[in-house]
A protein has these predicted regions:
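The feature marks proteins involved in alpha-glucan
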Residues: 1-90
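Substrate-binding/active-site clefts of carbohydrate-active enzymes
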Residues: 67-241
Length: 241
């Protein structure tokens, strides 16, 4: 079934609802359809042997946005990888490619950085992956799927997974441990796959029927619910592993 796209038709209280799979690990462009994936087929060469560098000395952490990190033409990155996951595989880049002032991971090495913290790289809802766009990514849509706008091919669900693995592998090879910024306290909108699959279970609702909005994003995930907590823990473990 690898590469097959699918969604669910759910009968809930007499209503037929179409939804993507909230547990999916791959999806199509813009995250509207889930994709069955054999994760072994997304492994770059040497992935099974890849390990993070050993923790040594002081932790010097550099937080970055995947697109911003390599988007500017002055960075000296090949055009087809600018703003994409594969940019992290480009070592020894320099300003305008002139070889004088380091950019990218070469610049991070010069700073003495040993941890790279990636701003959200799961699939989020505010950027049209078929066009050029920008957002920080704090609006999750598919929690267990990499963001497609950072991929060189957002239309084929396996590509974004492989390219993110390659990026992490390249960062490890260059001496960086990787931290992933995650957002489990709210979703892109209340019209989420979690809501469609089990209405009002995954969101915190007050006794008067109003939706909790402590996140100031229009909704709060109900992490106190047993299956919601399980979902979050399984998602974190999936990314970590």
């Amino acid at each position: 079934l690898h590469g097959v796209y699918y969604d669910f038709l759910l009968d809930i209280e007499g209503e037929r609802i179409q939804s993507a799979d909230p547990y999916a690990r791959a999806c199509g462009v813009n995250g509207t359809r889930s994709m069955a994936v054999d994760l072994r087929k997304t492994d770059p060469e040497g992935w099974e042997e890849d390990v993070a560098p050993q923790k040594e000395g002081e932790q010097i952490i550099y937080e970055l946005h995947v697109k911003e990190f390599s988007w500017d033409v002055s960075g000296g990155f090949p055009e087809h990888v600018r703003g994409k996951y594969p940019a992290f595989c480009c070592e020894n880049t320099s300003l305008y490619g002139e070889g004088t002032y380091p950019t990218g991971t070469a610049y991070l090495k010069q700073l003495g950085v040993n941890y790279v913290q990636l701003m959200p790289v799961y699939d989020y809802g505010s950027v049209d992956e078929t066009k050029d766009g920008f957002n920080w990514g704090y609006d999750p849509m598919n929690y267990n799927v990499p963001e497609g706008s950072y991929s060189t091919d957002p239309f084929h669900g396996e590509v974004r997974i492989r390219e993110l693995k390659e990026a992490i592998q390249a960062l490890h090879r260059q001496g960086f441990r990787v931290i992933m910024d995650v957002v489990y306290n709210h979703t892109y909108s209340l019209d989420s796959w979690l809501q469609k699959t089990m209405p009002w279970y995954f969101y915190r609702v007050w006794e008067d029927g109003s939706v909790s909005n402590g996140s100031a994003c229009g909704n709060d995930v109900a992490s106190e619910q047993a299956m919601c907590a399980k979902y979050i823990l399984e998602s974190v473990l999936y990314w970590a592993e």
